[in-house]
Amino acid sequence: MKRICFLPVVLLLTGLLCGCTGQQQNDPLPQEHNHAMEEGTETPKYDHLTVYSPLPESETLLYCSAFRKDTGITVDCIHLPAGEMTAQLEQERDNPQASVLLGGSADNYIQLREAGLLEAYQSPELTDVPEAYQDEQGVWNPIYIGTLCFACNTDWFARTGTPMPTCWDDLLSPALAGQIVMATPKSSGTSYTTLATLVQMRGEDKAWEYLQKLDQNVGLYTRSGVEPAERVKNGEYAVGIVFSHDAFRAALDGYPIEVRSPADGTGYEIGACALVRNAPERERENARIFIDWLTSSRGEECYIEAKSCRLPANSTARAADGLPPLDEVKLITYDLEWAGENRTRLISYFDTHIYSARTLS
């Protein structure tokens, strides 16, 4: 785990993108809170907050620094891939060390919600978020939208004359043997969304058959869902299966990356944040203030400064220039609840029959 403490010296499409005792573990705890996102709000007496996040450190540094400037609250952000973040919360169930989870796909939050690891809290800022992106049970809070895509290294495709992939089956081309990089769903929320997308598109039997074939072309499974875009932009691999914001970020930075959305349909994530159940009492108020800030237009417009290329969930937040509208992407009807409820089972099958089998071969 990497820990960064933000000290006193010194977050897309508009209209889309923790603790109490004495209750049952699977019964989320509703809380009332009416913190106003206004200047002059009195800083709580305890000015510290601990957060777990799978987002890149460069992003969380900016978000947490801006939050401290606005509120006077210092954030200690611990970086973990989504799967490892889940495992960490399980280990700390009786004594959580963090109060807020920042980022990662909502299907992961659904799994955590069902495991009784999250505290129910809904920011008042959600009045500006489309209902379709909100948690029906009122536990996690949506903050951005991201679609799955192929990040393609244009230099490699120009050099080899290989056609760029336009659909999922194109990734099975022999010309791409060893040239695909993706994360393992055991640790990465990005890769689990890929897995759940293929299962929902094709059915389980055909999805597993496809993934067995795809495995023959995968040169590397990474720990983090962000890393494949980094590997592709540096020319180590030809194609990365990533969320669009990670690919667009590299392209807008001038790297030889072209973003291809599968023409036969693709899944997406609703990026979320939430309170950790049974989190340190002294951080409870600060945690709610942070959730309110993250879901506000002020918080989500920090995506522009961070060059994260994330699509804000808050309809009043401005999105970065140059990002294609979601209506240009063929999205499947992605079932978040199903994905969350089946997460453990699908990851276990992938790990046993594809990833581990590969490592042992």
Predicted regions located by residue number:
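Conserved C-terminal helix/tail region of periplasmic/extracytoplasmic solute-binding proteins
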Residues: I332-S361
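A ligand-binding cleft/hinge motif common to bilobed small-molecule-binding domains
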Residues: D107-Q111, K233, A238-P256
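Mature extracytoplasmic/periplasmic domains
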Residues: V276-Y334
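Early extracytoplasmic/lumenal segment of secretory-pathway proteins
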Residues: G22, L29-Q111
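Extracytoplasmic ligand-binding site segments that recognize negatively charged/polar headgroups
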Residues: T50-L61, P96-E236
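A bilobed periplasmic-binding-protein/Venus flytrap-type ligand-binding module shared by bacterial periplasmic
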Residues: A151-W156, A196, I270-E283, C302-E305
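Periplasmic-binding protein-like
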Residues: G146, Y210-D215, Y221-T222, D253-R277
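Short, low-complexity disordered leader/linker segments with a strong preference
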Residues: M1-H48, T359-S361
